[in-house]
């Protein structure tokens, strides 16, 4: 019986070691461009901005020098909510590091609902790439396996971070491995249709009247001939889509 207790205790110890996480607050410098054009034509002259986020690495006790894939998460117009954290926890349980980008808190903003001008999508895209640049140098992160996901406004950040005129104005060297945009605003219809060749996937609710699905369908059809982009429209679903998917 004593041996059985020892075996159980050992198994619990091994599980706990393998389930450990390290949490780091990462600070970096970004800026406050108002528009995409500010980034493309005048990035160096934009007002500088200190930004931070939280990096969580699900340490594997077996592989001491292991580098982890990473997902950078970008919240929507109300900032970070419970369902966003459930996604990050899901990724962490899969052995993927996560980075909670805090574009709002860094600027003392709680919400942009109804205005959308306290911080713009352009500034948040810049934040995401500046975070990527810092995290690419982290000893536990595999810079070739860094993806981005976001919700609503953050979904727009995720989607248009793949637009090459923006990406190349910010950083020509680093590319996100994939882009998962959850109910993004797809109202931007660029004449230049050059997007990253990394996989881009849009997930949206058919009945969503805040970020409608039709513009996303139109955009995917426009880009699909030369871009690795796809769309999933969930029938009879509104903005509560991410919560439904996690039940």
Predicted regions and their residues:
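Acidic catalytic loop of the alpha/beta-hydrolase fold
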Residues: 207-211
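Conserved small/polar residues in nucleotide/adenosyl-binding loops
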Residues: 237-243
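N-terminal cap/lid segment of alpha/beta-hydrolase-fold proteins
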Residues: 20-63
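Short beta-strand/loop motif that positions the catalytic acidic residue
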Residues: 202-204
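Primarily recognizes the serine-hydrolase "nucleophile elbow" in alpha/beta-hydrolase
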Residues: 129-196
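Sec-dependent N-terminal signal peptides
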Residues: 4-15
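Short alpha-helix in the alpha/beta-hydrolase fold that links the catalytic acid
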Residues: 212-221
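Serine-hydrolase catalytic machinery in alpha/beta-hydrolase-like enzymes
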Residues: 41-44, 51, 66-136
């Amino acid at each position: 019986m004593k041996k059985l207790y020892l075996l159980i205790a050992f198994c619990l110890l091994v599980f706990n070691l393998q389930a450990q996480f390290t949490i780091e607050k990462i600070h970096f410098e970004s800026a406050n461009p108002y528009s995409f054009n500010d980034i493309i034509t005048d990035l160096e002259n934009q007002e500088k901005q200190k930004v931070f986020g939280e990096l969580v690495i699900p340490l594997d006790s077996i592989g001491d020098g292991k580098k982890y894939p990473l997902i950078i998460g970008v919240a929507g117009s109300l900032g970070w909510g419970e369902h966003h954290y459930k996604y990050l926890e899901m990724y962490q349980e899969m052995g993927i590091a996560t980075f909670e980008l805090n574009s709002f808190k860094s600027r003392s903003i709680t919400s942009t609902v109804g205005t959308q001008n306290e911080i713009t999508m352009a500034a948040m895209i810049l934040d995401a790439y500046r975070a990527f640049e810092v995290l690419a140098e982290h000893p536990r992160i595999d810079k070739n396996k860094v993806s981005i996901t976001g919700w609503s406004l953050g979904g727009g950040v995720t989607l248009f971070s793949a637009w090459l005129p923006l990406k190349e104005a910010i950083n020509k060297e680093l590319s996100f491995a994939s882009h998962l945009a959850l109910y993004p605003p797809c109202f931007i219809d660029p004449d230049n249709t050059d997007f990253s060749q990394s996989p881009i996937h849009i997930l949206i609710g058919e009945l969503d009247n805040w970020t409608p699905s039709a513009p996303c369908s139109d955009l995917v059809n426009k880009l699909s001939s030369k871009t690795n982009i796809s769309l999933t429209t969930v029938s009879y679903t509104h903005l509560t889509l991410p919560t439904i998917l996690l039940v």
